[in-house]
Amino acid sequence: MHSRDLIEQYKSYVQDWRRYFHKHPELSNEEFETTKTLAKELESMGVEVHVDTERGIGLIGIIRGGKPGKAIALRADIDALPVHEHNTVDYKSETEGKMHACGHDGHMAILLGAAKMLMSMKERIEGDVYLAFQPAEETGAGAPDFIKFGDWYDKIDAIFGGHVWIDLPAGLISVEEGPRMAASSQITINVKGKQGHGAQPHQAVDAIVVSSAIVMNLQTVVSRNVSALDSLVLTIGNIHSGSEWNVIPGEAKMGGTIRFFDPDQEEYYVESIRRVVEHTAEAYGATATLEYVKKVPPTINDPASSELAERVVIDTLGKDKLSKMRKVMPGEDFAWYLQDKPGCFAFIGIQNPEIEATYDHHNNRFNMDDTVLSAASAVYAEYAIQWLQEHK
């Protein structure tokens, strides 16, 4: 039996689970009931389940194959977002202010479907398949924390995962090699000037003016310090300074993010930003410091894993379902798994204008065409089977 033969059989199963999870969202590091539900369903299939009992969130399922061999992990993230849903569907979130607005409900359903398929094809599995249901992806720290849970990560030899993607038409899948999602880092800039009277600016060092100059000068990091052939996004998302209408503030704080694909350029990018921040402030008689926090590295598919994934998509769904898609600037903590293990991260098309599945991820109207999710389940299952068969 081939995974493609099970797509229709589990179509409703996967769709129903996606809608169940959509109705019952839980935020990052709060996925207690979600974890219990997943564990119960996997155990009902006969999957070996290991829950992170210390935290009560996240679990590893293990499917032991009919023959000995290596181990591969299939991963799904399980957290929702603090978003008030504005959809009117009958599976709308039942929890006020919480919503699966990024598609992780679909990821869980896809992996449950893959588990069902794998359990019915155990004779084809030459090794072990680990099912990694990871909490807290939205924090950026979910994967590093989950890697520390037990010894599952040490035991696997490769990993595969994916993200439903609203910019890709439903039914298409993209698995190209190389950078697929950007590194995501947080920057905080603290400016210190000199507070003064609003009528006497010459006796003060205006932190707002200094901050404004820093923001403007930072634009040259991208336009004049980075090659036009490289990709860097530098965004300042907030500025906080002052509280009175007639007082020149002496302090300001700014927050932002940088996104990039080449990890070898990270140090250069950070130092370029630091130089602009510090010297701009100095030119105005102020001081400024840069705090840099690395959230996730870039998600980079290795060539061999992507080549296998392309073959699997064509073999399972047909050549017309394999799509090419440009890399994207959002970050994904799946990247942490790829630091030490070979793997591939797929984009799974869910866009369908006929059902208004066109709103962007994190939007309060986000939705997906979930009729195509069982096809993704088949790709997950078949990738695991074929990877194990080719790496005896």
Q: Where are the regions that the model predicts?
A:
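Acidic/His- and Gly-rich active-site-bordering loop/insert found
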Residues: M1-H100, A109-I125
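Non-cysteine beta-strand/loop elements that form the S-adenosyl-L-methionine
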Residues: A73-R75, H84, I187, F345-I350
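A structural signal for isolated positions on well-ordered beta-strands in alpha/beta enzyme cores
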Residues: H50, Y130-A132, T289
